[in-house]
């Protein structure tokens, strides 16, 4: 598994760090709050308290050899920019950054993020789709603008039949 560094231990960062660690991944979790670092220290490989607005502090964290940096800082966009830029500068191969909106996403991309996530809007879209489709769909994962993977509850009449027997294309 890849070794990751998670910068910012709010709801998203903490959940990501603990979940990935529970799957067997190595996680370096970093936050400015000693309380948040203490809460997560038993669950991750390393938990570090650091001022993420200081370039030299970030460079001194020993994260240059991780495979992926995930920047989930929510309250201080300046810190997100600095962390993203420094991670790119020290050669971390892949950087994922959290943004609130497209403007933040564009800025983070310009300073080095390879992937931008918008947790609030992505959750809202997923909830709306689930509500619109009622109980038909259990989960929807968007692969691209034109492809999705859907986990659906199937009618009893479909059980035991293959896709050809169902003639789904004729019914759509």
Give the residues covered by each predicted segment.
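Cytosolic regulatory regions of ion transport systems
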Residues: 1-172
